Structure formats: C-alpha cells, structure tokens
Amino acid sequence: MFSTRISGDMKIFAADVAESSVTATCNTSVQQQQSQQLEFRTRMSAGSPSSKSGQCHLKFGKYNNKTANLLRQVNSCHSSNSSSNTSNNNNEAIKGQQQQPLHYCNSNNSHSWARKKYFGNGNSNNSLLQQQQQPSSFFQRQQQQHQMQMQQEKQATNNNDALMKNQNVVNAHVSDCKSSDSNNNSTSSSNNNSTISSNNNNTSSASNNNTGSSSSCSNRTKPAKWLNENSSSSSSSNNNNISCRNNNTSSIDTKRRNSSAGATAAYYRKSESESGSSEGAAESTETEATRTGGCNSNRTAESSSADGGTQATMGKSQDQEQDQTVKQRPRQQPLSFWKTNYPQTSATQLKDKETVAAVVSAAAVAAAAAAASASEQQQQQQSLSIEHRRNSGYQQHQQHNYYPYYYSQPKQLTIASFLQKEMLPDSTEKSSSNTGGSNMIRSSSNGNSNFSRHQYGHQSTGSGYQQQQQRYRNAQNVYQQYQHQQQHHAQQHTHPHFRRKHSDNGSGINKKMHYSPPGKSGDPADRSASGQQQHHHPHQQQKTIEILASSHFNAMHRRMQGGNNKNGYYQHSYNPMTGEVGSTPTRSEHQNIYNLTYIHVDTEATGEAASAAGSTPVVKPSLLSKPNISITPASSTTPTTVDRALLPAVRSVSAPASGSALPAPANHVRNMFPPPPLAMLGGHGLLSPVTTTTPTKMISCAQLDEAITAAAASGDKLSTSPSYNQAGHYIMPPQQQQQQQLSSHPIPTGTSSHPPPPPPPHMFFHFADGFCNPGQGHQAPPATMWPHSSSPCYPASYGSSCGSGTGAGTSPHNNDGNAGALRPASPALSSSSLGSESQWSGTSNRSRLGHNGHPSISPTPSALGSAQLSPHLAEMRVQHPLHQQHPPSHASHRPHGQMGGHAMSSYVPHRPPPPPHPSISSPNPTPVATGAGGPWYEMILPPDRYLAQARNIEVTVQPEKLICMCKYDNLSAEIWKRFRGAQQTHNKFKLKMRLWRYLYLWMHQPMFERYRICLVGSTITGFGTDSSDIDMCLLPEQGVHPHQHQYHQHHHFHNEKRTEALIILTLFNAVLKDTEVFQDFNLIEARVPILRFKDISNGIEVDLNFNNCVGIKNTYLLQLYAQMDWRTRPLVVIVKLWAQYHDINDAKRMTISSYSLVLMVLHYLQHACVPHVLPCLHSLYPEKFQLGQQDCLDLDLIEPIEPYQALNTQTLGEHLLGFFKYYSTFDFRNFAISIRTGGVLPVSTCRMAKSPKNDVYQWKELNIEEPFDLSNTARSVYDGPTFERVKAVFLISARRLDHTLDLATIFRPIHHVPEHFPQLQQHQQQFEQQLHHPISGQQRSAGGGGDGANPVPSTLNPDAASTFAETTAAHVA
C-alpha cells in the first residue's frame, strides 16, 4: 500500500524525524527529506502554516481545519469511482511527475500502514498533507514549473487548465459545487501553489476542488494540478475536492483559528485520514473508506505525485490493485487506469463527454436517487463532525471509529446532532443541484449537498462501479421509490424529534445496505413517487413529528397521537388485506417492539396515496367505503354508532383486549401496520399492554370489561364496551361478505368519502339471525376469516384445524353432527398452550373454531332462556386464517384436542358415539351464526378455547335418567337442584377466563416473556363451583422436556425445583403488586409453592403455582372423567359443598383438599360401585398416562372423550349415600385410594413407590395416591385428631342421609357427640392434655371414631353441652 514512503513523510513530525524519515523513505533523497523537515519546523515555529507568502494559508486555522473535516466527512465513495475516473490529463501529469523520483512511492495509498502505525488510523490526511507538504517556496515553485512543463507537453488542452501551477485559475465548478467551494478554490488559487479547478467532467463530484494541492504543493511534489479531470467523473472530482486541503471550506468541521494548533490537529487528522483511506481502499465495500481514499489520493498527489492521486481516483477494486502494483514498481506508471491506456482526447471531446455524463447522471438521479435522504445523511455527518472534531486528540484516537467499516449507510444521529439538525441548511435546496451528479457520493465540497451515498454513478464505466452498483442495487431501488417523496417533505424532517434511525429511504437501508436482501425494500417498486408524496404530505401539515415511509408503518408498538377511531392502546389499524398482492409492505425489519416511536399516520391519506400510486394495489371494498358503522344489537334499543370522523383521544387502555386484541378500523387501503413475525413477540402471539403502558392503565383484571362479561354471561348482544373506543369494522374477504349478505342482516353503513363498492361493508362481529334465532343458525354462510388473522395479537395459529387440514384424522367419536362432544384446545392450556407453540404459533393445527363438529359456547338465549352453553352446540365458525376459503363442513368433523401439533387423537376409544347425554347436551343444539361471526366479545378478545367448552359451564338441562321412579328420586332431585345452584356459572366462567387472559397478556413483557400461564384445576375440569378459586400454572416457555422431569436420582432434585418455584413466584408477587388490580398476596411456601392473590374487581382468588406439570396432567385426567358419566359432576360438587360446610375442605387446616375429595369420589365410582360407573383410564389408555411422562405440552386439557357406557343405573341419591357409607367404613390406616389402579393399594406399598416426589413420611392418616407422581395428595391430613373429626363427619353424615334420605340433613351442624362413642370423649380429653404434643398413630384408640369394620349405631344426644365439632376444632386450632 505504499506505506514506506508515506511513513517517511509522516515521521517528519516525530521527535526523531530525521532518523525515522531516512529509514522510512524509499525513493526520496535524504536531502529532500531534511529540507522538508526544516521547512515544516520553520513553519511551525513561525506559527503560520507556511513560510511562503500566506496568501493561501491566510485563513489556515479556519479553512485547513474545515478542509480536514470535509475530507473526513466525505465518504470514501468519492475515491472509489473517482479513482477510476482519472482522466488522461491526470495520466499526463502523472507521467511528468514520474520523472520526479521523490514522489513515485506516494501513490494513492501512500497514506498506508507505516503512517497508520505511528499516527493512528484517521481519515483526515488532508490536513496533514497540507501542513506537511509545504516545503520551501523555491522547491515548490521548481516542482510546479517542472510539472507544468511536463503536463503542457503531454496535453495543453487538459480540462485541468487551471492546473497551470502558478496561475491562479479556477475553472467553473460543477453544478453541485457550492459557492463556498468556489471561494475555497479561489482562495487556493490565490495561492500560487496551484489552483486546481474542479473538473467539469466530474459532474457528480461536488466542485472538484483540485486546488487541494495548491496549499500543499509540498514534499509530496505533484504540482497542484489535479489529476481529476476524468469525464467518467463518478467521484474523481470528489477526490480532488478531498485533496483540496485549505480550499475546501465547504467541510463542516469546526474551524480552528490557532494556526499552530490547527496544523498539529490537521497533521493528526491527515495521518489518520490517510490510514483510514488505506483501509477504505482495502475495503471495497465501504464507500466511506473509498471517499477518504479519494481524499488521500488527491492530497498525496499534491505532495507526492499525480501518479498517486490518479491511483486514488481509481475504482476501489482497481485502487487496491494499483496500490499493490505501485508497491512492486514504485517508479513505474500503472497501466491499469481507466482510459489511461488510450490516446488523450481533446478538451472539446472531454467536455462533450462531460455533457453526456451530466445528462446521464441527471437521469440516474431522477430515477434512482433520493437527494433528500443523502442531505440528511450528510447533515448528520456534519453535525457529528462539528460535535466531535473540536479537539485533535479525538481525531487521532477516534477517527477510525468515526467511520465504522460499514458506514456506507447513514449514521444514527446523536443528541448533539438533533440540536444541530435544525441549524443546518435544508436539504431540499441542494437536492435539486445534486441531479447533475449521478455518483451521489455526498461530495465533501458541497457541505450540505444531498448526494446520496448509494447513487453510484451511472456514468462511470468500469468493474469498480459495476461491483458497487451490484452491491447497492437495493438502495437504488429504494431511492427510486422515495425520491420525490423525500424531496417533497425534506424540510419537515428537521424537527428535533426526528429519529434518524428511521431514515427516509424507508426500507431498512440504514443498516449496511450491501447486506440488505432484495426483498428488503419496503414498498412495491412500481409504486410511484407521486403516490408517496401524497402518502406523506398530509402528515406534514398535521404534525411536525416523524414522517416514516410506509414500510416503516409495520412497526408493531407505536403509540399514535389521537388516532382516528383506532381502538385500544396500540393505535394501529390491523387490517389484513386478504389476497392483497404487493400492496402490503413485506419488510422483515420491524422496529423493536419496545422502542416506541411517536408518529401519526393519516390512514385516509395513505389510502389515497396508495390508490394514486403507479400500481393499483388490491383494494378491499370494505376499506374504500369508510362507513360510519352503526351497530344495532338485538338487546339494545339505541344503536351504537361508530363515527370515523371522530378522533377519540388517546386513552389508557382498561383492557388488554383493547390494547392488543382489538383490531382498529380499516381506514386505509394498504395495511400500514402489517404484523411483525411472531419471533418479535418472544414466541407469543399476543402483545402485552404492559410493554407500552403502566399496569395502572391496563384493564381491570378479571373482568377485562364488564360489558363483555355481561354479554358473555347472559348472551347479551351488546356490540360496544364502555371501556373501549368503538371498534372499527373488521375485514372480511369479499367472497365471505357476499355470502354473509345472503344469510345475515347487513349492518347499516353511513356515508363514506369513497363510493361504496357493491358488497357493503359489514361489522365482523355483528350478530346474525342464527345467534338470536337458533333455528336459522344453519343458514349461516361459511365463517369469515378472523379479522386479525395476520395481526400480532391474533396469529394465524388461531384458525381451526378444519380450515388448515392439518389435523390428524378424524376422531371416531366425532360423527355426531351437532352433538359431537369434541372440543377445541383447552383454555387451561391455551395460554401456556400448554402451548405457546400451539395456540399462539403459526404452525398450530389446533382446532379452535369448527362449524358443527366443534362444540361451541353458543348462548342461544331464545332456545335455552339463559346463558347456558352446551358443549354440543355447534361452535361459532371462524376459519383458519391461512385457509380462509375453506367451505363449510356440516357432515365432516375435524379432529380436536390438538395443541400446536400436540394431539391426542389416538386417545378416544374406537366405538360408535352414543347419543349425547341429555344432562350435558342442549335439547336444541344449534350452531352459532357463522357468517356474521359469534358474539362480539368473542371477536374482541382472543379466541378462548375455554369458552367453547360447555361442560365447564353451568348445565341447565335435567338428565333423563335423574328420576328413576325409586325412593331415591327426591334425593336425586335435591342433589341436582343444589348442583345447578352451586355449579360454576357461565358468568363466573367468563370472568375467570378474562382474568386468565389478562395475566396472559400481562406476562408478555420482557421480564416474563419466557413464561406461559395456563389454567388448571376445577375451572377446567368442570368440578368447580361458582365460589371456587381459579388455579393457574406458570410454565417456562421452553416447556418441560419429556426427559427433564424423568425420575431423577438426584437427591436434591425436588428441593432445587422448589427453590426455583419460590424465586419465580416471589418475583411475580413483587411485580403483580404494582399492577394495582390484585390484592391479598400470600406466598404459601408449601411443598408445591403457591402464590395466592385476589382480583380486586371481582373478588376471584387465584392460586398460582410454578412448573407443576403434575397439576396439569391431573386436570387433563379429571376433565376426561368428568365427561364419561353425567353423574360425576353433580356428585363431586355436592361432596365439595358438604366438605366446605363442615369445614373439612382446607388443606391449610390439615383437612382434605378439593383435589383429594375429587379423587375420593372418582375412586368410589370406580371401585365401590357395583357395577362401576367409571372405568380406569390408566388401564384403558396406558399410553396416555405413562408414569414419568411430564411433557405437559402434549396435553389437551379439554380433549373430548366419549361417555362411558356404564352398566350401573343407580341414581344420584343412591350414589351419594353409598359414598358416605363407603368412606365411613374405609380402612384408611392400611389402604390407600388409587385412581391409577382403579382400586386400593396397601399403604406400605405406596410408601415404597419410587418417585422423586414420593416420601415415606407422607403416608400417615388419609392416603390417596396421586395418579402421576405417586405421592400422597392428602398429605396435608397428617394430624390424627383432625382426621378423627373428619371421619366422624363422614360417619354422621352417612347416618343422617341413610336415615332420612334428605339432602338437607347432611348440611346441618353436627352439634352432638354420639353417646355410644366413648372413644371420642376420651380423645377430647387427650386433645386437652396433648394440645402441644400431637398424638402418634400408635397412641390413638382402636376404632378411631368409627373407622372400624363394625361401627356401632349412634343416636343423637340433644343434651350434650358441647358439640364434637366445636371441641375438636378448638383443640386442633
């Protein structure tokens, strides 16, 4: 890289100048170097830049520094093309200069590594060259004269006529050149050194200030004649500009008045810039480095030789090759220059070439360049240079970092640049002049010229340009798209809040353009610039905030100030254009989800712009109409009007659904906010309101919205919510809209600015006749696609597997058209999905919305007269977003129970489906109106698999077999009545679902994005009561690997997991407290830690555990048992109510947990009944319930299963009595209840079970085997006296019920102690004596209060002073 020569020159400044220069120089004599050193020292001592007449250096402190800064700013792009543009004139000068042995080694890259070694990597070679290259005036004059003679001999007609050394001739500048540049040239021309006129040929390069050599006709020799006259002119003149040290006043760098300090600073900058230019030459990909290289070449040519300068003006690739060539042959002229091997053309011909080049470049600029963006970029660098170049120390050490290797692209503005931006001149004025230069290399001579860096000259001819053109083709395409747009509103970008990172080019070319893929461009290439102008112009008049290209509009999280009728916190219009081709930006580089940009988008303007664009985008009819949508719900007398003219103020969202799930109205033709890929969401399909707002501004927890809850609970058809800005109309495919017109009442539409298309727009969530009139439900057309099919809040995974066809084959039990007991994926897992991959991922084949085979939550108020949701009612049909045109399927049923590929299709037994049981299915199963969509709250909130499970909601239809004309009929009727009154209502279920969804949305913040939350427990199984809490399980996002929880032999495995659970729950406890929507936090550090808190709005208590996969599998098992027989749910609910009444249903108080009570009921129905009512699922389907299989993500918590065809015909009353009798006589000491085996197991066997969660000391009083981890679920019942009281309650209840067959008798307090149970009285005395010393199992009296095989009949003693329950409770407490 010709480093030796330069190193010698640069070492002149060092302390050991003489020695180092002698050793470093390769072609210069010692005398010349010494003379240079002496001259420089004299100049420094004098405090002036030169010992000569200070004409040229009169303003050295100012112009020299500015020139240095200019050179630093001018990206090396200039040098790359300019090097190739070196004219034959330069060659002539080079040849003449070759005769001067002192300067042959100083080719373009004379700034090479030797100098870099001592002076760092800088881009300001100019200042150093300027100072260093000023030998004695005599020596300079001699060199100048010699150079002039040589060049005149070679060609007197060179365009570089001004090169005649001592003649201060300044040629006309390029149109791009600024007046300041011309002044600079004139200044340099005044210096007799040499005034290099900016080459007219180099039209693109701003004012080819070849005068750079004028001030520095120095040791480097090379008369100031500047080699750049090349007609190719891509950047050659720019190189000259760079080389013009003192002349280039256009550089924006800070001006140094102190000449000595300026000289020193310039020296460092020069050395740095030269080394930087060497890097630029080496890295052909860096336009900046090349531009610096151009500067170096000119500067080098000033002092060294036109040879070096000519090489600098070559293309990047040839520049490197020439450098190597010159190293090998320092005294020979390289022959690989462009146009140097051909005979010189006359000046007239060159001028003609210039004219042609100018025309071509102007055309290229008009077609491929955005001048405004370049001006912004240059202004940016200018501001940066002003800010960072105030001391030379920074230049020395930071210069190589100032232009990172990839900064062919714009640099992001700093705060200082924001402040400087308004003070800088507008770029629009200069953009017009830039049309003359197609090279668009942001010429340094034009301080604020808008040369786009990526406009590589369409004039240049050579491999270097072709490579660059290939590299920056994407940038050129983008600039073509946005040229007029940027010129139109360039002035608006001077706002201090303009974010430079969103550059005007609009397609992510901010980052390393040469790496951007071809598909990176934001808008279609055929979109006209005029359309873009219209697209952005309205914003300029409305606000001075950032105006982004349409490709930037897909940034997902951006608050918008006063968005037009944009519901929710995220003021975006998520309106997927189904079938739209080429009109939706496909840019994959989205703004960071958490990096909010305050912008305002006029959707109407964007729509007009898109329609006015050169290419006609596919426009959906519903988008053009822009109607005032009035929704008239069936239950509402006053229609709710949605007026797009209103601008609702931005309000804090009171519901996550409004923030992330509510689609905004489709006001514009193009989807300006296409959803980003799910990867940006952390693998989740929903957005977190917390990411953009404080918890206090989020929804009110469980209810999310009272109106939605009321509508969901009562079947109300309200279409508005008090906490939401009215939602705009949803988008439906035109085909579906037409179908919907046939079967549903169109929503009245108001006037619109555009003529309404033939199919009038419809509210997607309006209620069709089928909803209000179930009899007409079947007439509904195929369901419309989800309006949020491509919304980040509603990923494509939500579709039903019916549409996608990805389901694993139809299940054998899915043959009943309307009563098929098939259910989509469980809400219990919907959040964690137990599967984020399943429900929230695009690859999910989960069946969410089927037509008839899918049970739905259809309230059908007219049919049932209540908010009952039958599990067999056809579900609201919404097709899979990826398969929108899937035809309705009335006979065929798709598989259910699949969660993101985790399907249990092989689970169900292969037997013909029996008719739906009357107790579960609705007498009139009717599908919800599918064409118009289901209830509006279903559309607003994320698809909820829970809501589609009617079995989890109240059952109102009395079973046919409830009354069997026997003595137990009254008892059975009472049980059923109490069950209906206590079961989980639809309203409560909705509230719980909204509470879960709130937490699910809330968890989509960076802190908890790797976790998922799922519903478990009685809420999902159907065994819950209306007063029961909601159980949730927190799972890590990566899920539980099947081998992760295998039975580890590690001794501390369980303790480690428990510690992790405590840490995570403690973190959640701290963060949830800040939401101000929960209260009564309590972290229970039990064996399975639980975080308990309560919803303030609805009083719903939440039990949250961490990574408890066993609880998920239990939920899965129990919900299957609940479906197998209609008597299971009523029995479980009644037993739970009974236990709660007698205060024996509290694990914290050493009594039986609800889960243990459920297992006890199931065990009774499995084992104690003859014949049994329930089978043993572990025996029937061992593959589904393998021990150690802890992959909870494979489970579909609401997987349907056929009812079990039991031979047992006993009634509810008979089973309840049998339950009490069975456990009144059960041998709890020796046997354990086992659902896994469908029988009982010896306690000793259970103690020896090998399980990481099993403990020998768990098995004490009440022993119930956990079906999966083989632990004792009733381990909380470890206190003997407490369990004796529990057994007494069982016994007394059995006696009462058997004696009276009246359900009310078991819900009465037990006031008296049985007189024939002296053991109980003895126990009471023992309780008093051993209050603080619990009685061991061996100390208990035999019989234990009636647990023997032959209990003694008891009579009630009304005279007892104290009750058994009160006494035992007092002592136990």
Swiss-Prot record:
Disruption-associated phenotype: Pronuclear migration does not occur in activated eggs. Defects in spindle structures (abnormally shaped spindles, spindle spurs, ectopic spindles associated with lost chromosomes and mispositioning of the meiosis II spindles) correlated with very high frequencies of chromosome non-disjunction and loss. The polar body nuclei do not associate with their normal monastral arrays of microtubules, the sperm aster is reduced in size, and the centrosomes often dissociate from a mitotic spindle that forms in association with the male pronucleus.
Enzyme type, top EC level: transferase
One GO location term (cellular component): cytoplasm
Pfam family, one: PAP_assoc
Superkingdom field: Eukaryota
Enzyme Commission code(s) on record: 2.7.7.19
Tissue: Expressed in ovaries. Not expressed in adult males.
Listed cofactors: Mg(2+); Mn(2+)
PAP-associated domain boundaries: 1211-1272
Chain spans, region Disordered: 75-155, 175-340, 425-543, 734-770, 802-866, 880-928, 1320-1359
Biased composition (Basic residues): 486-502
Sample GO molecular function, one term: ATP binding
Amino acid composition bias (Low complexity), ranges on this chain: 75-91, 130-152, 180-219, 228-251, 274-284, 443-485, 735-753, 819-844, 880-890, 1320-1341
Stretches the record annotates as Sufficent for interaction with Dcr-2: 945-1373
Keywords linked to the UniProt accession: ATP-binding, Cytoplasm, Magnesium, Manganese, Metal-binding, mRNA processing, Nucleotide-binding, RNA-binding, Transferase
InterPro entries xref list: MTPAP-like_central, NT_sf, PAP_assoc
Protein purpose: Cytoplasmic poly(A) RNA polymerase that adds successive AMP monomers to the 3'-end of specific maternal RNAs (bcd, Tl, and tor), forming a poly(A) tail, during late oogenesis and early embryogenesis. In contrast to the canonical nuclear poly(A) RNA polymerase, it only adds poly(A) to selected cytoplasmic mRNAs. Required for localization of mRNAs to both poles of the egg, to recruit or maintain known centrosomal proteins with two types of microtubule organizing centers (MTOCs): the central MTOC that forms between the meiosis II tandem spindles and the centrosomes of the mitotic spindle.
Subunit structure, interactors included: Interacts with orb, an RNA-binding protein, generating an ovarian cytoplasmic polyadenylation complex. Interacts (via C-terminus) with Dcr-2.
Family to which the UniProt record says this protein belongs: Belongs to the DNA polymerase type-B-like family. GLD2 subfamily.
Name of the protein in its database record: Poly(A) RNA polymerase gld-2 homolog B
